[in-house]
């Protein structure tokens, strides 16, 4: 045991010869007897021994020379301050600071003696036994740097070192953690260097000023410190001497903190915003046969929406109630031959499928982010809901989109590079206009028309239509590029622009998109018109939509007035050669002096009297300045770099 001896003025340190020669037993001596210590200087030696009892009573059993003598000091006698000195292992004590010790029986309230099972027992630290209920109380008094020790069962052989808690940081500040937490034997010289290389300071207060710090240590954990025979001072050279050492794996000088929970909580999937009827509809819609038992519906919901894996079982009751009460589902007989009630299958009511599909799309548009967060595989949402354009061929728009007018969307913005194709007006195919559809009321009575069968390959943005009003407002100096209605088909084509200008059309012929798709972000054509965003439903074509297009950097450039006067056509130079849209028939310019255009094979006799560059769709045109001596006449091109202008 490593402890602090009282000053030499109060305690006499016996040598090894005295240990061997003294008889067994306890020799209790009072102060002032001949064997009492004589006054000496205040510099005491640091020794690997226990305290000396009152007066100073000593117990010197006949033990081997390497065994320490056990003693306990009087509370008023032992004083000192331990520091590492430069001498050969001696530690000097400062008289300015006191180290009050006390006996095991008459100690103050902070003494661990009150935790013993009977204070009348003779003092013997190796024979003290603590029970669990007693030591649990003592554990509250043990603290080092604000942290208590770990405890296991009964403890034996403790030494008490009352220390002020405010000065606990100064207690052996430079000792490495291995010196406290390991029980390995240290070489004498190495351990001496550890002690001498750091200041060992114990700054106590009076015993009645506060609770003390008690260092409990088991008896069998030994270390070897450099010393002469027992009760002698430290020296670099000398024999090794086993003392109980505080640093054991079971009672380390270290902080005892609760272990942090290393397992992070997995993010919980939120409850899907879909109703139970919608979830059942998704399960039945994505089944192979169109009908499922209740157990398979459960499996579908737990597989795609993990919330139901940990949800209370009440959700299964809700599923069963929806199946039995909702008219969108009907029970069908199991064709496998099972007649039990559990073997019945559930299928969709054919008359309610459209309604459920609309409801499904509405919820997806309402909060698509929340829908995907609740799914185990968000990328499967579109496949579970169904093809967004599965109803693209419905009669909502009057006719199916053939050719290039496929499911791909057309965005009336700047086209992608590399898609520039020379574009020429077409002759409208004779035929009645399509009937009125729901979009007519929405768009002011102007319905989109299907392109003529003569040119099925052209984009709907170039399809013919009846006489319409401009889709977008035309500011002063901006006119629509449309021939007057009274022009006969064999009349010359009205002039496009003066020779110094050329017109370019912005379009994207690779794909087409209906106006309904433009208004509905997700492209759902199966929903009612009241499901459209009200901000788009109630807009005025002369206002909000135009402002929105202007916000998208769709700037306008002035256009020269377009007339159908025959005299203006003579100002045009010979037009360039005709170009075609692959793979259908192309429109060729006749090459006559008047700049007339005619379809291929028609010769120079016929020209286009009515030219409509757009119907319900918008086309963006810009004039590009060219030298007045340009040999080529005006032509309509697809150009990704031109600034668009809306025409109707």
UniProtKB/Swiss-Prot annotation:
Compositionally biased tracts (Polar residues): 38-50
GO cellular component term, pick one: nucleus
Span list, region Disordered: 1-95, 392-432, 457-521, 629-648
Gene null: resulting phenotype: Mice exhibit nude skin phenotype and acute thymic atrophy with a severe early block in thymic epithelial cells (TECs) differentiation. A more severe deterioration seen in medullary thymic epithelial cells (mTECs) than in cortical thymic epithelial cells (cTECs).
GO terms under biological process: blood vessel morphogenesis; epidermis development; hair follicle development; hemopoiesis; keratinocyte differentiation; lymphocyte homeostasis; lymphoid lineage cell migration into thymus; nail development
DNA-binding region ranges: 271-367
Function: Transcriptional regulator which regulates the development, differentiation, and function of thymic epithelial cells (TECs) both in the prenatal and postnatal thymus. Acts as a master regulator of the TECs lineage development and is required from the onset of differentiation in progenitor TECs in the developing fetus to the final differentiation steps through which TECs mature to acquire their full functionality.
Disease: Defects in FOXN1 are the cause of the nude/severe combined immunodeficiency (SCID) phenotype which is characterized by athymia and hairlessness. Mice develop largely normal hair follicles and produce hair shafts. However, presumably because of a lack of certain hair keratins, the hair shafts that are generated twist and coil in the hair follicle infundibulum, which becomes dilated. Since hair shafts fail to penetrate the epidermis, macroscopic nudity results and generates the grossly misleading impression that nude mice are hairless.
Protein name: Forkhead box protein N1
Phylogenetic placement of the source organism: Eukaryota, Metazoa, Chordata, Craniata, Vertebrata
Gene: Foxn1
